[in-house]
């Protein structure tokens, strides 16, 4: 046992010297590259107790190498965490690449979406959500996914799904209905895409209300995208829809999306590009 302790003390008090290292005027070992100490003296009391007067210390280049290594490891861990959040958080894999960095900047509501991310702590604390409403193809889903991606980059867990997926999951789930909904509501932010497009059956509406109501009671923010108009949301056609819409509009600040249909514009751009390529090929023959 005594030999083991002595070996341990020797190990923690011995510095390995490189060929270019040298002993300074203070008797300590110095790095031959950065010329800073690779040793430091113990206090007098500690030196007497250990029987050694010095211990290894990081020179400047060792410290720089360690910090660089730790930064790389931290970055890799962050990338793996974000990748896992995106894999779990997006039910549609294509949305993983929908980010502010890839945005074309043409949507006037981009600033509103960025503001949500920048103010996340406040939005979370005050339970403030968004209701993106407007015509088809105006960028609602894209900017909602941008918010999700940006928060995931901050290592915030977000779930972006839709009621078609939720209803299918509930029908096929081996876990109980309550457990599934509780898991959905455990996310700091829940995003429901294409709200209002789900089946209008009695069962379907009951499940929609259950999810919305559970989220409301959780006190956590919700973002929803919908093609419904604000008029339709504020004046629903029947009581089941009224219950759902009332909960939704009480949780989310309405944000209107207007303008051209980006999907149609993209399709037109592709068509024009195709015509250009065909013309170039014809001219080259």
Which role fits each region the language model picked out?
Residues 127-131, 157-158, 189, 221:
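Residue-level preference for the first positions of well-ordered beta-strands
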Residues 194-195:
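Walker B catalytic acidic pair
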């Amino acid at each position: 046992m005594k030999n083991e302790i002595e070996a341990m003390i020797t190990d923690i008090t011995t510095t390995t010297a490189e060929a270019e290292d040298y002993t300074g005027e203070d008797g300590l070992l110095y790095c031959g590259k950065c010329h800073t100490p690779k040793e430091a003296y113990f206090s007098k009391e500690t030196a007497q107790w250990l029987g050694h007067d010095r211990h290894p210390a990081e020179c400047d280049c060792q410290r720089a190498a360690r910090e660089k290594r730790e930064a790389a490891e931290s970055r890799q861990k962050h990338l793996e965490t974000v990748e896992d959040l995106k894999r779990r958080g997006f039910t549609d894999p294509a949305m993983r690449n929908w980010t502010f960095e890839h945005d074309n900047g043409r949507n006037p509501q981009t600033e509103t979406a960025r503001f949500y991310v920048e103010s996340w702590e406040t939005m979370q604390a005050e339970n403030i959500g968004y209701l993106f409403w407007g015509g088809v193809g105006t960028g609602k889903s894209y900017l909602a996914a941008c918010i999700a991606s940006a928060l995931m980059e901050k290592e915030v867990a977000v779930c972006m799904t839709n009621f078609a997926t939720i209803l299918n999951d509930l029908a096929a789930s081996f876990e109980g209905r309550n457990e599934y909904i509780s898991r959905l509501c455990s996310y700091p932010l829940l995003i429901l895409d294409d709200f209002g497009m789900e089946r209008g059956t009695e069962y379907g509406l009951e499940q929609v209300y259950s999810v919305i109501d559970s989220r409301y009671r959780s006190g956590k923010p919700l973002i929803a995208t919908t093609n419904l108009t604000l008029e339709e949301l504020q004046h629903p056609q029947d009581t089941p829809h009224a219950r759902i819409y009332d909960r939704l509009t009480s949780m989310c600040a309405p944000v209107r999306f207007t303008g051209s249909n980006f999907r149609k514009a993209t399709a037109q751009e592709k068509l024009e590009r195709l015509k250009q390529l065909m013309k170039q090929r014809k001219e080259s023959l």
